Protein backbone atom coordinates (compact mmCIF):
# COMPACT_ATOMS: atom_id res chain seq x y z
CA UNK A 1 0.00 0.00 0.00
CA UNK A 2 1.47 3.35 -1.08
CA UNK A 3 0.93 6.42 1.10
CA UNK A 4 0.10 9.54 -0.97
CA UNK A 5 2.71 12.30 -0.86
CA UNK A 6 0.81 14.71 1.42
CA UNK A 7 -0.31 11.94 3.77
CA UNK A 8 3.20 10.50 3.79
CA UNK A 9 4.51 13.88 4.93
CA UNK A 10 1.98 13.95 7.77
CA UNK A 11 2.98 10.44 8.85
CA UNK A 12 6.60 11.58 8.97
CA UNK A 13 5.53 14.60 11.04
CA UNK A 14 3.67 12.39 13.50
CA UNK A 15 6.64 10.04 13.77
CA UNK A 16 8.98 12.94 14.52
CA UNK A 17 6.56 14.30 17.13
CA UNK A 18 6.27 10.85 18.72
CA UNK A 19 10.06 10.52 18.90
CA UNK A 20 10.45 13.98 20.45
CA UNK A 21 7.65 13.27 22.93
CA UNK A 22 9.26 9.96 23.91
CA UNK A 23 12.57 11.69 24.53
CA UNK A 24 10.92 14.42 26.61
CA UNK A 25 8.88 11.94 28.66
CA UNK A 26 10.18 12.26 32.23
CA UNK A 27 11.60 9.23 33.96
CA UNK A 28 9.23 7.46 36.35
CA UNK A 29 12.01 7.77 38.94
CA UNK A 30 11.96 11.58 38.73
CA UNK A 31 11.53 13.16 42.16
CA UNK A 32 11.97 9.86 43.99
CA UNK A 33 14.78 9.03 46.43
CA UNK A 34 16.85 5.84 46.46
CA UNK A 35 19.58 4.76 48.90
CA UNK A 36 22.45 2.98 47.13
CA UNK A 37 24.74 0.85 49.28
CA UNK A 38 28.03 -0.25 47.67
CA UNK A 39 28.99 -3.36 49.64
CA UNK A 40 32.16 -3.55 51.76
CA UNK A 41 34.82 -0.81 51.46
CA UNK A 42 37.78 0.53 53.40
CA UNK A 43 39.28 -2.18 55.60
CA UNK A 44 36.88 -4.76 54.14
CA UNK A 45 37.70 -5.77 50.55
CA UNK A 46 34.87 -8.25 50.28
CA UNK A 47 35.49 -11.04 47.78
CA UNK A 48 38.73 -10.92 45.77
CA UNK A 49 39.02 -12.63 42.38
CA UNK A 50 41.92 -14.70 41.06
CA UNK A 51 43.19 -11.70 39.11
CA UNK A 52 42.92 -9.46 42.18
CA UNK A 53 39.65 -7.69 41.36
CA UNK A 54 38.07 -6.60 44.64
CA UNK A 55 34.36 -6.69 45.37
CA UNK A 56 34.44 -3.33 47.16
CA UNK A 57 35.80 -1.64 44.00
CA UNK A 58 33.28 -3.19 41.61
CA UNK A 59 30.40 -2.43 43.96
CA UNK A 60 31.45 1.21 44.29
CA UNK A 61 31.94 1.67 40.54
CA UNK A 62 28.52 0.24 39.67
CA UNK A 63 26.89 2.22 42.49
CA UNK A 64 28.43 5.48 41.31
CA UNK A 65 27.32 4.90 37.73
CA UNK A 66 23.84 4.16 39.09
CA UNK A 67 23.92 7.36 41.14
CA UNK A 68 24.89 9.37 38.06
CA UNK A 69 22.11 7.86 35.94
CA UNK A 70 19.52 8.47 38.64
CA UNK A 71 20.56 12.11 38.87
CA UNK A 72 20.22 12.41 35.10
CA UNK A 73 16.71 10.96 35.43
CA UNK A 74 15.79 13.63 37.98
CA UNK A 75 15.87 11.26 40.94
CA UNK A 76 17.76 11.64 44.22
CA UNK A 77 20.44 9.10 45.12
CA UNK A 78 21.82 8.78 48.63
CA UNK A 79 25.07 6.80 48.82
CA UNK A 80 26.14 4.95 51.96
CA UNK A 81 29.71 5.57 50.77
CA UNK A 82 31.19 7.44 47.82
CA UNK A 83 34.81 6.41 48.39
CA UNK A 84 36.83 3.39 49.47
CA UNK A 85 36.09 3.80 53.18
CA UNK A 86 34.42 2.03 56.08
CA UNK A 87 30.96 3.54 56.57
CA UNK A 88 31.13 3.46 60.39
CA UNK A 89 34.84 3.92 61.14
CA UNK A 90 38.13 2.26 60.23
CA UNK A 91 38.21 -1.32 61.39
CA UNK A 92 34.65 -1.27 62.73
CA UNK A 93 33.04 -4.64 63.46
CA UNK A 94 30.81 -6.19 60.82
CA UNK A 95 27.58 -5.60 62.83
CA UNK A 96 28.51 -1.96 63.45
CA UNK A 97 29.38 -1.46 59.79
CA UNK A 98 26.07 -2.94 58.64
CA UNK A 99 24.14 -0.82 61.13
CA UNK A 100 25.92 2.29 59.84
CA UNK A 101 24.57 1.53 56.36
CA UNK A 102 21.07 1.07 57.75
CA UNK A 103 21.47 4.34 59.68
CA UNK A 104 22.11 6.22 56.43
CA UNK A 105 18.73 5.02 55.20
CA UNK A 106 16.95 5.77 58.49
CA UNK A 107 18.41 9.30 58.51
CA UNK A 108 16.56 10.02 55.25
CA UNK A 109 12.81 9.54 55.76
CA UNK A 110 12.27 10.65 52.16
CA UNK A 111 14.08 7.53 50.90
CA UNK A 112 11.77 5.04 49.18
CA UNK A 113 14.10 2.20 48.14
CA UNK A 114 17.33 0.66 49.44
CA UNK A 115 19.65 -1.08 46.97
CA UNK A 116 22.76 -2.93 48.15
CA UNK A 117 25.34 -3.80 45.48
CA UNK A 118 27.63 -6.83 45.85
CA UNK A 119 29.60 -9.48 43.95
CA UNK A 120 29.61 -13.17 44.75
CA UNK A 121 32.37 -15.71 45.42
CA UNK A 122 32.64 -19.45 45.93
CA UNK A 123 35.37 -22.06 46.43
CA UNK A 124 34.52 -23.67 43.09
CA UNK A 125 35.56 -21.35 40.21
CA UNK A 126 32.85 -22.89 38.02
CA UNK A 127 30.12 -21.24 40.11
CA UNK A 128 28.59 -18.52 37.98
CA UNK A 129 25.66 -16.18 37.46
CA UNK A 130 23.83 -13.31 39.12
CA UNK A 131 21.10 -13.33 41.75
CA UNK A 132 19.02 -10.98 43.87
CA UNK A 133 18.03 -11.24 47.52
CA UNK A 134 15.10 -9.83 49.47
CA UNK A 135 13.52 -10.07 52.91
CA UNK A 136 9.70 -9.64 52.91
CA UNK A 137 9.31 -6.96 55.56
CA UNK A 138 7.04 -4.88 53.29
CA UNK A 139 4.62 -5.76 50.50
CA UNK A 140 7.10 -4.52 47.90
CA UNK A 141 10.49 -6.08 48.78
CA UNK A 142 10.04 -9.18 46.62
CA UNK A 143 8.61 -7.17 43.74
CA UNK A 144 11.56 -4.75 43.78
CA UNK A 145 13.99 -7.70 43.82
CA UNK A 146 12.18 -9.35 40.91
CA UNK A 147 12.44 -6.20 38.76
CA UNK A 148 16.14 -5.81 39.53
CA UNK A 149 16.81 -9.45 38.76
CA UNK A 150 14.93 -9.34 35.47
CA UNK A 151 16.75 -6.25 34.22
CA UNK A 152 20.18 -7.45 35.36
CA UNK A 153 19.73 -10.83 33.70
CA UNK A 154 18.70 -9.20 30.42
CA UNK A 155 21.52 -6.64 30.42
CA UNK A 156 24.39 -8.63 31.88
CA UNK A 157 23.90 -11.83 29.95
CA UNK A 158 24.94 -14.02 32.88
CA UNK A 159 23.17 -17.14 34.10
CA UNK A 160 20.13 -16.09 36.13
CA UNK A 161 20.16 -17.73 39.56
CA UNK A 162 16.87 -16.02 40.42
CA UNK A 163 15.55 -14.10 43.40
CA UNK A 164 16.04 -15.55 46.85
CA UNK A 165 14.83 -14.96 50.39
CA UNK A 166 17.60 -14.00 52.83
CA UNK A 167 17.90 -12.58 56.32
CA UNK A 168 20.73 -10.19 55.48
CA UNK A 169 21.03 -7.42 58.06
CA UNK A 170 20.51 -4.48 55.69
CA UNK A 171 17.41 -6.12 54.22
CA UNK A 172 15.82 -6.79 57.60
CA UNK A 173 16.63 -3.54 59.40
CA UNK A 174 15.87 -0.93 56.77
CA UNK A 175 12.28 0.31 56.91
CA UNK A 176 11.72 0.63 53.18
CA UNK A 177 11.63 -1.95 50.35
CA UNK A 178 15.17 -3.26 49.95
CA UNK A 179 17.10 -5.68 47.76
CA UNK A 180 20.67 -6.93 47.53
CA UNK A 181 22.09 -7.75 44.11
CA UNK A 182 24.98 -10.15 43.50
CA UNK A 183 26.29 -9.05 40.10
CA UNK A 184 28.36 -12.15 39.38
CA UNK A 185 31.12 -14.38 40.77
CA UNK A 186 34.57 -12.87 41.21
CA UNK A 187 35.76 -16.42 41.86
CA UNK A 188 34.85 -17.22 38.23
CA UNK A 189 37.66 -15.88 35.98
CA UNK A 190 35.34 -15.02 33.08
CA UNK A 191 32.89 -13.15 35.28
CA UNK A 192 35.73 -11.45 37.16
CA UNK A 193 37.00 -10.01 33.87
CA UNK A 194 33.53 -8.77 32.96
CA UNK A 195 32.90 -7.20 36.37
CA UNK A 196 36.19 -5.28 36.15
CA UNK A 197 35.22 -3.77 32.78
CA UNK A 198 33.90 -0.20 32.97
CA UNK A 199 31.56 -0.61 29.98
CA UNK A 200 30.02 -3.70 31.58
CA UNK A 201 29.69 -1.89 34.91
CA UNK A 202 27.79 0.92 33.17
CA UNK A 203 25.51 -1.61 31.48
CA UNK A 204 24.67 -3.11 34.88
CA UNK A 205 24.00 0.36 36.29
CA UNK A 206 21.61 1.09 33.43
CA UNK A 207 19.78 -2.14 34.24
CA UNK A 208 19.47 -1.18 37.90
CA UNK A 209 18.04 2.21 36.96
CA UNK A 210 15.55 0.64 34.53
CA UNK A 211 14.34 -1.61 37.35
CA UNK A 212 13.97 1.39 39.68
CA UNK A 213 12.04 3.28 37.00
CA UNK A 214 9.74 0.30 36.46
CA UNK A 215 9.15 0.06 40.20
CA UNK A 216 7.93 3.66 40.41
CA UNK A 217 6.08 3.40 37.10
CA UNK A 218 4.05 0.56 38.58
CA UNK A 219 3.27 2.52 41.71
CA UNK A 220 5.72 0.71 43.94
CA UNK A 221 3.90 -2.60 44.21
CA UNK A 222 3.09 -5.51 41.96
Which residues does each predicted region cover?
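Active-site-adjacent mobile loop/cap segments within catalytic or ligand-binding domains
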Residues: 123, 159-222
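Short secondary-structure junctions
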Residues: 1, 155-160
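Periplasmic N-terminal soluble interaction domains immediately after the signal peptide in Gram-negative
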Residues: 1-11
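Catalytic-core regions of hydrolytic enzymes
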Residues: 9-11, 21-146, 150, 154
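Intrinsically disordered, low-complexity polar regions and short flexible loop motifs
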Residues: 17-18
Amino acid sequence: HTIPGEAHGKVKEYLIIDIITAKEQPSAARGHTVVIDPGHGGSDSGAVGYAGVREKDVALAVARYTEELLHEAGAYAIMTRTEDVDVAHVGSSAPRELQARVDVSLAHPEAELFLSVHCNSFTNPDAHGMETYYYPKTDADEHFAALLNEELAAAGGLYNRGIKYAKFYVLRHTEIPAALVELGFLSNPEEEALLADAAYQKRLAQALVRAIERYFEQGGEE
